[in-house]
């Protein structure tokens, strides 16, 4: 369904936190950790949350927008750095978030005559269409905003909350914390006190760096673009390497996941040389299956570099609080052969390899992983990079602004060949994920994905 020509921007409101901050710990800047630097130039992350308000159209301007705008301002009392600016000046050894009294977050107000149900019913959309529901960040080589929001009204009274954020300021867990806090304030009204678990911690001292990993990344980032050129202080995110791709939504049901587990176990019994996977978690099983579908659909080259992000908040010593705001994620990287993944034991190979690298992350010094990342960050011509984003462990129901949780969610992957896991409703044991691929590639993947699920179902009968 094409909606690109039907979205009209009505207004852009600059929303500032109240003049008197409730958190006096905020100074004029916040430093970045090595986890933040890892994402300094990554493409912006984007989310689309669709809500049924059950309100008349007239309430959009009279009630919905004022409520969202005012609660956003109150939320920024505790999340003040999100209204700041990421900069890397010529006089600074490192980038930082600058905080000023006149900082604000842009809130775009838009409307469309598109039918949202058609958008939900069709699992495939053009990426350019979805971008019409998403606001841009203000970015340049020297400065970048951290957050932009857009509210779009549909004729049915449904609304879409579009979010674009700079990854250097926050990871998925931090964004989820911000949205839960905003939703809590919006839902309760009149500046309610936030529960302690919804108050962010921006103190960078929680990220211990005794081996100076941060300097490794600063040296890497400052490398001149050309030999003998100036040191590279750009904070501009990379542009997405595609704008003509299809966005595809897929789902693995509880039965699908159990069938996959049984298939892995069966293959292990047949091949005694293979050790059982260290983990049979839902994420490992899902990623293993999707990765083998990628390979069987002919979407990879001779080798695959698979990147699975791991939240290190509880893995660091000492552990980092759950409400720490920033990045605390590292991508576990492992190389695999496409021939091995396409073979009869491909599902086992993928599951075992993915689970083992996570176990290795638990047991090893994190500096080693960062050093290996810098040494092996280039992709050869015979290698395809397949990454994972998002999380199934964030709850959609916690994003209730007063109209119930989102009816639908669409993540917009920042990279091609990126498996983006979606948040789930409480009690949902299935997995939704999305991909961004060229139209023909999407058709090939869908065919292999569905056909192999049917084979698994027959084997389980």
From Swiss-Prot:
Keyword Acyltransferase: yes
Broad class of enzyme this protein falls into: transferase
Protein residues bound to malonyl-CoA: 281-282
Pfam families: Transferase (PF02458)
EC number(s) given by UniProt: 2.3.1.-, 2.3.1.116
Record's catalysed reaction(s): a flavonol 3-O-beta-D-glucoside + malonyl-CoA = a flavonol 3-O-(6-O-malonyl-beta-D-glucoside) + CoA; kaempferol 3-O-beta-D-glucoside + malonyl-CoA = kaempferol 3-O-(6-O-malonyl-beta-D-glucoside) + CoA; quercetin 3-O-beta-D-glucoside + malonyl-CoA = quercetin 3-O-(6-O-malonyl-beta-D-glucoside) + CoA; a flavonol 7-O-beta-D-glucoside + malonyl-CoA = a flavonol 7-O-(6-O-malonyl-beta-D-glucoside) + CoA
Keyword list, A-Z: Acyltransferase, Detoxification, Transferase
GO biological process: detoxification; response to toxic substance
Tree of life domain: Eukaryota
Membrane-spanning residues: none
SUPFAM superfamilies, sorted: CoA-dependent acyltransferases
MF term (GO), any: flavonol-3-O-beta-glucoside O-malonyltransferase activity
Motif placement: HXXXD motif: 167-171
Active-site residues from the entry: 167, 400
Tissue: Expressed in all tissues. Most highly expressed in the abdomen and especially in the gut.
InterPro entries reported for this sequence: CAT-like_dom_sf, Plant_metabolite_acyltrans
Motif annotated as DFGWG motif, chain positions: 400-404
Function, as annotated: Phenolic glucoside malonyltransferase that neutralizes phenolic glycosides in host plants. Catalyzes the transfer of a malonyl group from malonyl-CoA to the phenolic glycosides, leading to their detoxification. Phenolic glycosides, which are among the most abundant plant secondary metabolites, act as plant defense compounds: they strongly affect growth, development and behavior of insect herbivores.
UniProt similarity note: Belongs to the plant acyltransferase family. Phenolic glucoside malonyltransferase subfamily.
PANTHER family assigned: PTHR31625
Note: MAT1 protein-coding gene was acquired from plants through a plant-to-insect horizontal gene transfer event.
Identification of the protein by name: Phenolic glucoside malonyltransferase 1
Record organism: Bemisia tabaci (Sweetpotato whitefly)
